[in-house]
Amino acid sequence: MLYFILLPLLFLVISYKFLYSKTQRFNLPPGPPSRPFVGHLHLMKPPIHRLLQRYSNQYGPIFSLRFGSRRVVVITSPSLAQESFTGQNDIVLSSRPLQLTAKYVAYNHTTVGTAPYGDHWRNLRRICSQEILSSHRLINFQHIRKDEILRMLTRLSRYTQTSNESNDFTHIELEPLLSDLTFNNIVRMVTGKRYYGDDVNNKEEAELFKKLVYDIAMYSGANHSADYLPILKLFGNKFEKEVKAIGKSMDDILQRLLDECRRDKEGNTMVNHLISLQQQQPEYYTDVIIKGLMMSMMLAGTETSAVTLEWAMANLLRNPEVLEKARSEIDEKIGKDRLIDESDIAVLPYLQNVVSETFRLFPVAPFLIPRSPTDDMKIGGYDVPRDTIVMVNAWAIHRDPEIWEEPEKFNPDRYNDGCGSDYYVYKLMPFGNGRRTCPGAGLGQRIVTLALGSLIQCFEWENVKGEEMDMSESTGLGMRKMDPLRAMCRPRPIMSKLLL
C-alpha cells in the first residue's frame, strides 16, 4: 500500500525538478511567485480574465504563469498580439493545447477549433471557408435567418398583446427568446430542423441539445487541474467521467441528425452538402469529420450569438440615448413600412458601431481560445518554449485605457474617429486573429446585427423600473450575463403591418 502512495509522489517530485531545470534555460516573462507542483492553479478564481488583467497591471503586457506541469504565457497588448499573429510566429503559434474536454467532446482534438496545426486542420478550415461558410452559401441560407427573426418578433408581439391589453409596456425575460432565435438559426442551416418556438421537432431532444451546448461551454472554460497535473488520473477523475458522458450524449444526437439528413435526399442543408461530398470522397469525409463540423457550427454559432445579443440589449437599456440614436438611424434609412434586411446593414453604420462596442466590452471568449507553439519562439523579447499555453486576454486589451478613451463607457461613437478598420485589427479581437480566427465570424456578425436592428426597429424598450441592472458576467467559455436580462417592451406601429 505504501508503495502505491510513494511512487506517484516520487514521480511528481522528479517531474517538478525536470520542469524547473528546463525553465532555468529560458528567459521567460516575469510572473507572480508560484507554489511547488500546482504552480498558480490555486490562484485561478473566476472571472479569470479580470484576475489576469490585474497581473498584467503588475507584471507588464506579457507575463508567465504555471498551471501544474504546464507553462502559461499571457499577452495583454495589441502590439504583442500582432507580433504573435503575423508572419512566422502565427504559423508556429497555430496549434492548440490538448485538453480533456476536447479529447472527449471534440472527437479527440479533430474538429476545426481544437485540431493541432497541420494538413488535417488546413483541410477543415478550407471546408469551412469554401464549402459551408462561403458568402454564396450564407446568402443561400439568408431566408432562414429572416424567417427566424420574423418568428421571434411575432412571438414577442403576441406575448405583449396577450399579457397587456392596454398596449402598455410588458415585462419580459429576453434570454430564452434570444437563445431560441440563435439555436433555431444554426440548427436549421445545419440540419433543417426547428427546435424551439412553434412548428418544432422533438422537444425532448431540443432541450437535451441546449443543455449539452451549455455544459460544453462551461466545461471548456473550466480551469481543471486534471489537464495540468496528469498524476491525478491515478486517483480517479470525476471531471473526466463527466466530460466523457457529455461527449457521448452529444455524439448520439449528432449521429441521429446526420442519419436523418442522409435519409432526406432532397434536403438543402449544410449536412446534406457534406453528405454529397462524402459520396465523392468517402475516405476523408467520414461520419466523424461531418459530426465534428456539425458540432463546431452549433457550438460556435448558438450560445455565442445569444450571449452577445443579450449584452447588446443590456447596454442599450442602460444607455437610452444610444438606443434612441440607433432607432432614429433605422427609421431614417429604412423607414417604418418594412423590416430591416441584411442588405441594409451596410447603410446603418451606427448600428454596426453598437455591435462593435458590445464585442469590445463583452467578448464571449474573453481570452480567446488558447494556443500552443509547435516550436520554441520569442514574443516581446522573451522566450516562449514549445508546448506553452499562450493566452491573449482580449477582454483586458478591449478595456485598456492607453488604447481606449473612457474604456468602461459604452460609446458607439468612438468608432467615428476616421481611423478605419485596419486601426482596430489588434485592438478589437472578438473572433481572434491570425490563422485561427473564428471561421464563423461573418455569420455571427450577420445574425447579431440583423436581430438587434429588428428588435430596435419593432419595439420600444425600457429598463424595469426600480431594478438596478447587474452587469456581472458568469464563468465558462462563453461570457454569459450572470443575471438574465429582464426588460419592458411595447410594439411599435410597424409590428401591426408585419403581422397583416
Swiss-Prot record:
Q: What class of enzyme is it?
A: oxidoreductase
What cofactor is this protein dependent on? heme
InterPro entries named in the record: Cyt_P450, Cyt_P450_CS, Cyt_P450_E_grp-I, Cyt_P450_sf, Plant_Cytochrome_P450_Monoox
Q: Where does the record say this protein resides?
A: Membrane
Cite the binding residues for heme.
438
What's a Pfam family in this record?
Answer: p450
The terms describing its cellular component in GO are: endoplasmic reticulum; membrane
Per the record, the GO terms for biological process are: indole glucosinolate metabolic process
Membrane-spanning segments? 1-21
From the UniProt record, give the pathway where this protein acts: Secondary metabolite biosynthesis
Q: What is its EC number?
A: 1.14.-.-
**Gene3D superfamilies given for it?**
Cytochrome P450
Cross-link for Glycyl lysine isopeptide (Lys-Gly) (interchain with G-Cter in ubiquitin), residue positions: 248
Q: Name one GO molecular function term.
A: monooxygenase activity
Q: How does it sit in the membrane?
A: Single-pass membrane protein
Predominant cellular place of this UniProt entry's protein: membrane
Q: What does this protein do?
A: Involved in indole glucosinolate biosynthesis. Catalyzes hydroxylation reactions of the glucosinolate indole ring. Converts indol-3-yl-methylglucosinolate (I3M) to 4-hydroxy-indol-3-yl-methylglucosinolate (4OH-I3M) and/or 1-hydroxy-indol-3-yl-methylglucosinolate (1OH-I3M) intermediates. These hydroxy intermediates are converted to 4-methoxy-indol-3-yl-methylglucosinolate (4MO-I3M) and 1-methoxy-indol-3-yl-methylglucosinolate (1MO-I3M) by indole glucosinolate methyltransferase 1 and 2 (IGMT1 and IGMT2).
Family in the record: Belongs to the cytochrome P450 family.
Q: Any idea what this protein is called?
A: Cytochrome P450 81F1
Q: Which organism is it from?
A: Arabidopsis thaliana
